[in-house]
Amino acid sequence: MEGQRTQRRGYLKDKATVSNLVEEEMENGMDGEEEDGGDEDKRKKVMERVRGPSTDRVPSRLCQVDRCTVNLTEAKQYYRRHRVCEVHAKASAATVAGVRQRFCQQCSRFHELPEFDEAKRSCRRRLAGHNERRRKISGDSFGEGSGRRGFSGQLIQTQERNRVDRKLPMTNSSFKRPQIR
């Protein structure tokens, strides 16, 4: 979470820097260039000077796998965002930048093949985190807010209570044993 905040601050700082540069360039009159077209044209020229040509910002509409020519303009948003076609997102291996890799479903990016267990679709790192969260055992994990529902959850709750009951000594002074005569 802290990393996201830091990244966001950095992004906002960069964005503010670009805004300041644009305003500064506009105030200076583009360093003696002639004004032909108004504020909007001027702003575009300044933005191009600050950020670089707009062609650098246009994302590729093709799958990033080597020699794949699938056009992603009609693909689902997920595939466009990650620049991978549906076939290569589910493939056991693909060549990206000359290296054999597999698309990780958890990270939504390509990893080298040794980072996966056998035919798994998630890298070891993300899979380990997922399994850790699944197996986490704490007092809160069996409460109402847990993801466990139904009979098996009730059975686990009962087993946990029995374990606790067996460990508690019977030293309560208000407890009276029934006497059989």
From Swiss-Prot:
Expressed in the inflorescence apical meristem and young flowers. Residues 1-10 have a biased composition (Basic residues). It comes from the Eukaryota. Keywords: Cytoplasm, DNA-binding, Metal-binding, Nucleus, Transcription, Transcription regulation, Zinc, Zinc-finger. Binds 2 Zn(2+) ions per subunit. It is found in: Nucleus; Cytoplasm. Residues 170-181 have a biased composition (Polar residues). Residues 1-58, 128-181 are annotated as: Disordered. Residues 22-39 have a biased composition (Acidic residues). One of its GO terms (biological process) is regulation of DNA-templated transcription. A motif (Bipartite nuclear localization signal) lies at residues 120-136. GO terms for cellular component: cytoplasm; nucleus. The keyword Protease does not apply. Disulfide bonds: none annotated. The keyword Iron does not apply. Induction: Negatively regulated by microRNAs miR156. Zn(2+) 2 binds at residues 104, 107, 111, 123. It holds the Pfam family SBP. InterPro entries: SBP-like, SBP_dom, SBP_sf. Its cofactor is Zn(2+). Residues 40-51 have a biased composition (Basic and acidic residues). One of its GO terms (molecular function) is DNA-binding transcription factor activity. This is Squamosa promoter-binding-like protein 5. It comes from Arabidopsis thaliana (Mouse-ear cress).
